[in-house]
Amino acid sequence: MLNIQAGATRARSKVVVKGCILGPSGIGKTSQLWTLDPATTLFVDMEAGDLAVSKWTGDRIDVFKEAQRMELPVWEFAVNLACWLGGPSPLSMTETQTYSASHYKYVCELFGDPKALDKYETIFIDSITVASRASLSWCKVQPAAISEKTGKPDTRGAYGLLKQEMVSWLTQLQHVDKNIWMVGILDKTTDDFNRTVWSPQIEGSGTVNALPGIFDQIISMVELTDGDGGKCRAFVCHTLNQWGFPAKDRSRCLDLIEPPNLGTLMEKIAAGDPGVPSLNLSMPAGSAAHKVTS
């Protein structure tokens, strides 16, 4: 029998958030760990750049060292970890596919009993930038990235496989019943019209384009100018912002600018009750929409 979740039950269910914090190098993304409870947070370190949080007392997985110890490519380790965190995926149509029940069984034998994860409420992954590089390196040596005609590397094939791998990995993590937060580098470039463009430093445009559909929250951690002309760090949380930073707030509980504190941000989302849709769906009086005639 199909289980239809009642509205009252759904309203009482635990709030878990999937989010990504993007920011320039050195802005303090990894240091957001200090705002999280070390007793219930697992730090997945792909960067080997944890100097800023070396005294943080929570649990940590050193992805590079563990992959090296298990004699696995870094990307294969990351995929196995996502499977271990999320369990078998109903999106896997055969037992030979990644994230299938067979894959999950193999991963549990490799990593151990997944009950070890029960104590964690939040998984903090540093970073999606490095994950995409590891994925691309792996994709470049797969058969799909080698031309059948010439036997030479096929760049288009490699990037096509990269999109599949990254989106599948992120989707697997999306369905983990825990808070999932990733951090990544935010690049600043200038286009042909001398306009500033902010974009995630992630290999493959397909992955970048898929992010808003996967994550609940996309936060840009950036430097802004305060009312006194001084510089300050801030979280930019709304898609419509005057600076063009990538951002999204599915919770509808956040202001345009929030203090740069992930722990406080999560508490606000968990406690917030947006009620009826808070989006402003009306058009400005002087907009082009009001001038259209039949």
Named regions from a protein language model:
Residues M1-N3, S13, V17, D228-S294:
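C-terminal regions of RecA-like/P-loop NTPase motor modules
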Residues L2, K14-Y106, A116-T122, T129-A134:
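Conserved P-loop
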Residues L2-T9, C108-F111:
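A short, compositionally biased domain-edge/stem linker segment
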Residues I4, G26-K29, E165-M166, G204:
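Amphipathic coiled-coil/heptad-repeat helices and related helical stalk/stem segments
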Residues R10-S13, N179:
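Glycine-rich phosphate-binding loop of ATP-dependent small-molecule kinases
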Residues A11-R12, Q32-T35, D113-A116, Q172-Q174, ...:
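A general structural signal for short secondary-structure junctions and capping/turn motifs
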Residues D118-A210:
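P-loop NTPase motor core
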Residues K178-P259:
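Phosphate-binding/switch region of NTP-binding enzymes
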